[in-house]
Amino acid sequence: MLSRFNIHQPFKRCKFRFFLRSIGNPDTILVESCSSSSCSSPEPSLVRSDYLTKPSDQDQIFPLNKIIARCVRSGDIDGALRVFHGMRAKNTITWNSLLIGISKDPSRMMEAHQLFDEIPEPDTFSYNIMLSCYVRNVNFEKAQSFFDRMPFKDAASWNTMITGYARRGEMEKARELFYSMMEKNEVSWNAMISGYIECGDLEKASHFFKVAPVRGVVAWTAMITGYMKAKKVELAEAMFKDMTVNKNLVTWNAMISGYVENSRPEDGLKLFRAMLEEGIRPNSSGLSSALLGCSELSALQLGRQIHQIVSKSTLCNDVTALTSLISMYCKCGELGDAWKLFEVMKKKDVVAWNAMISGYAQHGNADKALCLFREMIDNKIRPDWITFVAVLLACNHAGLVNIGMAYFESMVRDYKVEPQPDHYTCMVDLLGRAGKLEEALKLIRSMPFRPHAAVFGTLLGACRVHKNVELAEFAAEKLLQLNSQNAAGYVQLANIYASKNRWEDVARVRKRMKESNVVKVPGYSWIEIRNKVHHFRSSDRIHPELDSIHKKLKELEKKMKLAGYKPELEFALHNVEEEQKEKLLLWHSEKLAVAFGCIKLPQGSQIQVFKNLRICGDCHKAIKFISEIEKREIIVRDTTRFHHFKDGSCSCGDYW
């Protein structure tokens, strides 16, 4: 009878909390109607009192337990407490339901402990809730002590402790408990496999996987994740292919993210498409991995398709998914689309702000990046260490030395953010490229932790710009001491020697590189034309339209020289005649890609080229001339930033 009143909207507006305050003893029939209503939160209907009967206290327990559980699920612990304290009769389920909610909040540990002690007849589930609370929120000595004093333990009790130790990396203790456990289940085996994987011990993880009596999807996925983290992609592929159980979304995500993180974004995106064809809907994690792959490849069209998937799904307001889209648009050169998306986001967390600030920094728009940082502070968003990497990067790309130093000092003073290695790398780059090499070296020596390889690599790059051979030799030696397989260190030093025509030293560096079995990462550039990606390497001999590309480049070279272009021969890193050096420079991969864009794209339209290494000085100079000759905007993204070439100048102001 009562439930029919739920169709009347005025009655739905009556709030549940007001109801609890005004009626100390809710009626069972009314509560059951509330529980079955289609309302998003429990709300009573108003009815004539003569329709109601007075139930016993015991009859109220079940429906009120349901309300407590609903409050806990929605995070309304105070509401659950009000219902709890208003109940004249309770059972163990009542106590357990409230304990679940309170125990999840680290700040209410004492309250949870007190509540547990008050349970008249705690059962195994009560003990397991409290054990999980200790494992999550306090030191393991107390958790172990509580576990040892438990009057009865089930598989969940043992698994909680094993999983807790495994997540802390204490695998010996986890192993000891595992072998003390009388009846192990699938969760027990999964905890051991995952624990060894987190510790990087794939051998032991593989052993437990092989001897496990039941291997479910969790175990298979854990092994795939472990192999991907260890860069053993072929083993992960074999595991994925040989799975004897159905793959779930987490399994697909592990493979897709693994491909992208192991520099195989093409395979990751191919698998993402296969997942969609299987009818599996991606979650925010899978979409983020796919969008990262799009960013790596500058696959803008696929990125836009993923944007459509997000817009038509329940993830349309998901902060993680939208932030990944912003990052993708920024890295694909579509800063305008990124900004539009950022503006319409209903909720922005620090990660979203970081993505947009980083986008402006990568494109060399320091004013916008720093303005956005100030707006972020005004919006009471607390910056983190990644925020300051983006801010310092913006200063770096614009050569704002004093402003960068001010922000570096402000990090600790005003925001209590301790400088990380990445912050020091940004500052060394900022000082070094401004010619303040000694100050950069002084900063490295003042670092509160051991300098890392990247900071010496950055100093080495600055030495090349300013042709400081002595400091370059020091930086290179330090770099190679920290990472003897760092190809960039050898190449940078050889390039500095080459710029000084010290060919014997170049030969010595190359010999050392060969003896150390270090292979230089080959430079290449790519451009997307009508949804097809075209790759180019220096002195490319493979592309089917190479003849027309060479013809176009020779035409451009003549026009550039008439306009005042002189090749920067120091970037031709071979001991050959000047004429041969000019030819080598003309066939650099970024020039080949730009020329191909000039041929294939409509006159006056924008050209976007991407390179896997830093753009060379001669190419940077030449593309400025080409942008003026062709009357086009040419955008080149290298490993450090975006260069926007237009009307004979670059957005970086030649500061890169």
Curated annotation (Swiss-Prot):
GO BP: any one term: RNA modification
Positions annotated as PPR repeat: 60-94, 95-122, 123-153, 154-188, 189-215, 216-246, 248-282, 283-317, 318-348, 349-383, 384-414, 420-454
Region Type E motif, annotated ranges: 455-530
Region annotation Type E(+) motif: where it falls in the sequence: 531-561
Presequence positions on this chain: 1-71
Keyword Ion transport attached: no
Keywords in alphabetical order: Mitochondrion, Repeat, Transit peptide
PROSITE patterns: PPR
Localisation: Mitochondrion
The family this protein is said to belong to: Belongs to the PPR family. PCMP-H subfamily.
NCBIfam families per UniProt: PPR
Protein name as catalogued: Pentatricopeptide repeat-containing protein At4g16835, mitochondrial
Native source species: Arabidopsis thaliana (Mouse-ear cress)
Species lineage: Eukaryota, Viridiplantae, Streptophyta, Embryophyta, Tracheophyta
